[in-house]
Amino acid sequence: MNLQESRRVLEELGHPVLALPEDSAGRFPDGDAWRIEIPSCEGPRVMAAVIDEASQRGVKIHRISQGSGVMMLTDAEIVEMVRLGREHDIEVCLFLGPRGSWDTGGQAKVSAAVGGVARGGRAVAASLVDAFRAVELGVNSLLVGDLGVLQLLDRLKSDGRLPADLVLKTSVLMPLPNGPTAAIYERAGATSLNVSTDLDLSTLGEIRAATTAPIDMYVEVPDDQGGSVRFYDVPDVVRIAAPVYLKMGVRNAPNIYPVGQHLAGTAEALGRERVRRAEMVLRLLAAEQKGDPS
């Protein structure tokens, strides 16, 4: 029994499931409605472990993202990640390192919502240094946690100092709870939007109606961002929010940022488990598509 069949049974029993928003007609350039993103891919060793696990499980990975920041990777590590990405057709998205939760201000310690901001002009300048360094080493996708930095990067793309096709992906640390906010981020230069982790399906539909950029959504949410596990929502998420990246967090796992050799084993194990989670989500999607009368 898949979800569609289960809903028909509930309706027969007098408990119909309320209608959801209309299907999204949006798609990625290749025509797909969804892609798989593995977050917290902290360096080439973790990326290699993720690729190995994906090969064993038959899971296609479209994007990996890294959270410790460009500043926490050596040039050689970045170059190796870019090489792995090209070899396996995976987008490599690196976080811009400076952020409020690592800075001197106490406010960032009391709310994760401001953890990704660049505090002051010095942090903004450092973010641009990270951006240019990553691009010079072959990276074509940046993970941005600050609205002002996002807009500056977009201006640098427009005047030719950064590549016109550079992906600017907003971080989950930039709250995105509604359509108007999504539209603001897109106008500021975002080309991929990480929505807030606790949104219902109707709100996702509103965000999709407000923007054409791909949506990124955690379907298992890290504990420090809410801890939801939403596997059974995924078929409806794809239907409503396409084009959408399905992100695999892992609950009951430590926050490993900034990662280093002292956490290498943990980071690799978490990367492999995220791929396993992706396999389970893909099984659900396949079951729903098999049962779709269309």
Residue ranges and their predicted role:
Residues R133, T181-I184:
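Well-formed, non-transmembrane alpha-helical positions, independent of function
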Residues L142, A190-S196:
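Conserved catalytic-core segments centered on acid/base and nucleophilic motifs
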Residues M1-V139, V144-L176, L201-S294:
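Active-site pocket-lining/capping segments in soluble small-molecule metabolic enzymes
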Residues A183-E186, T203:
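Acidic/histidine-rich catalytic cores of soluble enzymes
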